[in-house]
Regions:
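Histidine-acidic metal/acid-base catalytic patches
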Residues: 1-11, 15, 19-30, 103, ...
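Hydrophobic anchor at the start of a short beta-strand
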Residues: 7, 63, 149
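Structural motif corresponding to the early beta-alpha repeats
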Residues: 35, 39-132, 240, 244-254
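Active-site acidic/histidine proton-transfer and metal-coordination neighborhood
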Residues: 81-181, 263-271
């Protein structure tokens, strides 16, 4: 690719939650050959952003930040108090992003992960409007920090609201704020999209972040993902930015249960990271 890709990996591959002690992973991530580390923020109070920033600098790593949106961080909840909790959490995340000098916060922040139900069209509209109105407020908050938000479609088993590139673009259009942008995750795309290349083109220049693993959450290159189409799509839109491996360790039981990881996907998590990066560089570097 002629445009610059930063190859990254999420610390979820090894640990959960991310804390200040997780900086012990950074030398290994750099040694493996990564440009970027992705920090998932489950609890902002566990993270000393200035300590993290120094460790990133010491190891020559760039950083991206994603949020974690469980039942207590649901902008479509019927109780406005839950919205307030989510706003407070997002404010903490935005402050962390500013200290780390990143440009956006990523994640499926329109609703709670795992909220997947059959509801009436009337209820769906109520929840959609809640998401739009609350995300307009989130965008105003983000803009106050000179940040964007990267909204992520999830597969149908994890969300009943935003599953495809077309869905997320409708959401971005309805929000109608320049801070509303998009993250695409190849794992979810292999479940929901009819054509990966077309989906990427649907998002176009709204795409500011990309996550990948495989259709089975395993090492990139070992599954059914149409990687040629993936690369062509990113080439079409002249994408430059992060290409981050996001998978999980079955050793952290709570996290494994949340994402349905019941078995190891490689001999070790380090091998997962090593093999995955090798494949991505072979595929996405010209």
């Amino acid at each position: 690719m002629s445009n610059k890709i930063d190859f990254g990996v999420s610390t979820w591959l090894w640990q959960s939650p991310f804390t200040s002690k997780s900086i012990e992973l950074f030398p290994k991530i750099k040694k493996l050959g990564y440009d970027l580390v992705e920090i998932p923020v489950e609890d902002p109070l566990l993270i000393d952003a200035r300590e993290i920033k120094k460790a990133l600098s010491d190891n020559g790593l760039k950083v991206s930040v994603c949020g974690a949106f469980g039942p207590t961080k649901d902008l479509t909840h019927e109780d406005p108090k839950v919205h307030r909790q989510c706003f407070d959490y997002l404010e903490q995340c935005f402050e962390l992003c500013n200290i780390l000098e990143v440009d956006f916060l990523a994640g499926p922040m329109y609703s709670a992960v795992g909220k997947a139900r059959m509801v009436s069209p009337e209820q769906r509209k109520v929840e959609w409007d809640l998401a739009v109105n609350n995300l307009q407020e989130v965008c105003i908050m983000a803009a106050g920090h000179e940040l964007s938000i990267a909204l992520e479609p999830l597969n149908r088993f994890e969300s009943d609201m935003v599953n495809t590139a077309e869905d997320v673009m409708r959401l971005v259009t309805d929000i109608n704020h320049p801070s509303a942008r998009v993250l695409l995750d190849g794992f979810h795309m292999t479940i929901e999209e009819r054509n990966i290349r077309e989906a990427i083109n649907t998002v176009g220049d709204k795409l500011i972040h990309v996550q990948v693993s495989e259709n089975h959450r395993g090492v990139p290159g070992t599954g059914l993902t149409p990687w040629t189409d993936f690369k062509l799509g990113l080439d079409d839109i002249k994408y430059s930015g992060g290409l981050v491996i996001e998978s999980f360790t079955p050793e952290i039981k709570e996290l494994a249960a949340a994402v349905c990881i019941w078995k190891t996907m490689a001999k070790s998590q380090d091998e997962f990271a090593q093999q995955g990066l090798k494949f991505l560089k072979q595929t996405f570097n010209d």
